UniProtKB/Swiss-Prot annotation:
Heme binds at H23. Keywords: Electron transport, Heme, Iron, Membrane, Metal-binding, Photosynthesis, Photosystem II, Thylakoid, Transmembrane, Transmembrane helix, Transport. Its main location: membrane. With its partner (PsbE) binds heme. PSII binds additional chlorophylls, carotenoids and specific lipids. Heterodimer of an alpha subunit and a beta subunit. PSII is composed of 1 copy each of membrane proteins PsbA, PsbB, PsbC, PsbD, PsbE, PsbF, PsbH, PsbI, PsbJ, PsbK, PsbL, PsbM, PsbT, PsbX, PsbY, PsbZ, Psb30/Ycf12, peripheral proteins PsbO, CyanoQ (PsbQ), PsbU, PsbV and a large number of cofactors. It forms dimeric complexes. This is Cytochrome b559 subunit beta. It comes from Synechococcus elongatus (strain ATCC 33912 / PCC 7942 / FACHB-805).
């Protein structure tokens, strides 16, 4: 995180496979945890 242009290739932003994997796993997991936590309170 010190120098952004030292060990990365020429046109390769951080907005790629790593970003997609983090959000493809993080966003649904947070959604499902919220849904499961909400289900705990609506038991008849």
């Amino acid at each position: 995180m010190t120098s952004n242009n030292s060990n990365q290739p020429i046109t390769y932003p951080i907005f790629t496979v790593r970003w997609l994997s983090v959000h493809a796993l993080g966003v649904p997991s947070v959604f499902f945890l919220g849904a499961i936590a909400a289900m705990q309170f609506i038991q008849r």
